[in-house]
Amino acid sequence: NSLARLINVLAAAENLEGADVDILKGELYAMRALYHFDLARVFAKLPSTTDMNDLGIVLSTEVYPTDYIGTRATLQQTYDQILKDIETALPLLSKDKQTGHINYWGALAIRARAYLYLEKNKEALADCKEIIASSPYKLYTRDEYIGAWDKEGTNEAIFEILVTPNYNAQRNSIGYFTHASGYGECAATESFLEELAKHPGDISTELFAKETDNGYDGTYPQKYKGRDGQIYVNNPKVVRLSEVY
């Protein structure tokens, strides 16, 4: 549904002009690339494990009639489309920080990730170097790390999806899914806790705590407590600067 709505908006925007419209078009092309990339990673083989003539996904690049039945593209065609959409998006996108919107740096990071899947390491490295050298984002400090996850527009978040108490706050959110007072579906295993104990100086170990879920004790992640204690309200961070490193 998200991809279909995106394509409908993109089709309508093709007849519009202006700087704001160009940025919108850039965001739409970048998001179309991301949607196809996510679908390819779930429903197709990894490029590094098969021939590029193997099956990819059904590409969605235009408004189709209701009785349309698509056929799967090859893996090569799939990744060609992903890279083509990012190439189209980049000159249209803003380089300013835009919380909740994908910008130039977010699209560049997604392209670097796609290049890694294609084992084009030199190209991926070039994109990552540009982001590290020229983008307005900074790595979290140790003091910032623990409290960064329930905040919006943090230094390291290149692209995040906005969630507010009125928009997108759902029980299928990352906060409700992981927290003991929600679904509590992400309790740490004993072997994982043993591994954490080997690294007492790792700040990320502080993101786990013992809690009780319906009478069952467990150790649960504390990343997504939610803004103002609302576990529904967490912005999923799609791209962070640390991933670029």
Regions found by a protein language model. Give the residues of each.
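Conserved, well-structured interaction surfaces
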Residues: 1-43, 91-95, 229-241
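Second-shell loop/turn segments in exported
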Residues: 15-17, 64-75, 98, 113, ...
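"A position-specific structural signal for the A-helix of alpha-solenoid helical repeats
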Residues: 24, 31, 38, 103, ...
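Short coil/turn linking the two alpha-helices of tandem helical-hairpin repeats
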Residues: 40-47, 97, 117-119
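Short, flexible, mixed-charge acidic loops at enzyme active sites
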Residues: 48-61
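Hydrophobic-face positions in mid-chain alpha helices that act as interaction patches
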Residues: 125-241
